[in-house]
């Protein structure tokens, strides 16, 4: 594991990655607004010179219909911060006809993270996850490290690893 000089306190996302052999690097910044995804993207672009399309946000959606036994009605969509999630497409990828954005308090309670810091990794309750196919275009992508102001440079041979960590 490689960390930046200003490493954050351990988060469940970092703990989940530490249990794997997937290389990653932690990048932190001072969070100064309520526009977490955009702010993170702006900071990472300026500080590291990365493409904004390499930076992914984690969105929690609620699927319509009754979930299978033991399955949550919530799911996670990981998409570039430069795009808007098409909720209907995410629902279809998860086998549902419809979905909507989950209420913030429900997303926070279920994942164990605060809005603006929800990570696809190390969630309190593991949710089904779909990842935008554009992740395949990059050797590295950035996702939330599990708190506001913490991004992970995530290097993996497969974005599918995001949904299993």
Question: Which residues make up each language-model segment?
Answer:
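Charge-dense, helix-prone N-terminal extensions
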Residues: 2, 24-29, 48, 55, ...
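Translation machinery proteins
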Residues: 27-67
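Single conserved hydrophobic/aromatic residue that forms the stacking wall/gate
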Residues: 154-165
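Short, well-structured beta-strand/strand-turn elements
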Residues: 22-33, 96-106
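N-terminal, charge-rich interaction modules
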Residues: 3-30
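RNA pseudouridine synthases
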Residues: 59, 70-78, 89, 95
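Short, surface-exposed beta-edge/turn micro-motifs
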Residues: 56-58, 71-75, 126-127, 138-140, ...
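Long, charge-patterned amphipathic alpha-helical coiled-coil/hairpin "stalk" segments used as oligomerization
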Residues: 82-146
